[in-house]
Amino acid sequence: MNPRKKVDLKLIIVGAIGVGKTSLLHQYVHKTFYEEYQTTLGASILSKIIILGDTTLKLQIWDTGGQERFRSMVSTFYKGSDGCILAFDVTDLESFEALDIWRGDVLAKIVPMEQSYPMVLLGNKIDLADRKVPQEVAQGWCREKDIPYFEVSAKNDINVVQAFEMLASRALSRYQSILENHLTESIKLSPDQSRSRCC
């Protein structure tokens, strides 16, 4: 029996202030929900180990602050990430309207810039009654960008695990693809090496 492969992945969670990024992360990692709101300044990091197929994944998940004044500082944390959760609050239209900016910030920091960079969108706080962003509108935004969409509740633990593990799965696939391409490139012979030489 083959031992499990071990892979470390860096994931980030971004979005406007107050959308519940920290609550989503704590629900996923610790199965807890805190009623009191505290603003994340800069970034905090939580880790979780999961098993996907024959691979043990160590997820290092960076929870980034959503305050406008810290955006340039926070965006430095995006570098080297393997995937991103974009989050908005379904009761806050402005948080949804800001998604293009957040997505653009993330993609601008990814090296190399790739269309295949994995993202998922989470519409949080579906447990609240005063919804402002219709599900169809969020789904339409995601269809345009080919991003999976999850309606979630950090408070009631609805779809949180599914969303994070969808991102982890996509990030792992991308990681494996990059690794395979790198190995293929390193095996190819250069033109000089491919010609047989006589002494």
Curated annotation (Swiss-Prot):
Switch 1, switch 2 and the interswitch regions are characteristic of Rab GTPases and mediate the interactions with Rab downstream effectors. The switch regions undergo conformational changes upon nucleotide binding which drive interaction with specific sets of effector proteins, with most effectors only binding to GTP-bound Rab. A motif (Switch 1) lies at residues 28-41. GTP binds at residues 15-22, 34-40, 63-67, 124-127, 154-155. Expressed in heart, placenta, lung, skeletal muscle and peripheral blood leukocyte. A motif (Switch 2) lies at residues 67-82. The lineage of its organism: Eukaryota, Metazoa, Chordata, Craniata, Vertebrata. One of its GO terms (molecular function) is GTPase activity. Coiled coil: none annotated. One of its GO terms (cellular component) is phagocytic vesicle. GO terms for biological process: cellular response to type II interferon; endosome to lysosome transport; late endosome to Golgi transport; negative regulation of toll-like receptor 4 signaling pathway; negative regulation of toll-like receptor 9 signaling pathway; phagosome-lysosome fusion; positive regulation of interleukin-6 production; positive regulation of megakaryocyte differentiation. The keyword Lipoprotein applies. Belongs to the small GTPase superfamily. Rab family. It is a lipid-anchor. A lipid is attached at residues 198-199 (S-geranylgeranyl cysteine). Keywords: Cytoplasmic vesicle, Endosome, Golgi apparatus, GTP-binding, Lipoprotein, Lysosome, Membrane, Nucleotide-binding, Phosphoprotein, Prenylation, Protein transport, Transport. Controls vesicular trafficking from endosomes to the trans-Golgi network (TGN). Acts as a negative regulator of TLR9 signaling and can suppress TLR9-triggered TNFA, IL6, and IFNB production in macrophages by promoting TLR9 lysosomal degradation. Also negatively regulates TLR4 signaling in macrophages by promoting lysosomal degradation of TLR4. Promotes megakaryocytic differentiation by increasing NF-kappa-B-dependent IL6 production and subsequently enhancing the association of STAT3 with GATA1. Not involved in the regulation of the EGF- and EGFR degradation pathway. It is found in: Late endosome; Lysosome; Golgi apparatus; Golgi apparatus, trans-Golgi network. This is Ras-related protein Rab-7b. The modification Phosphoserine is found at residue 186.
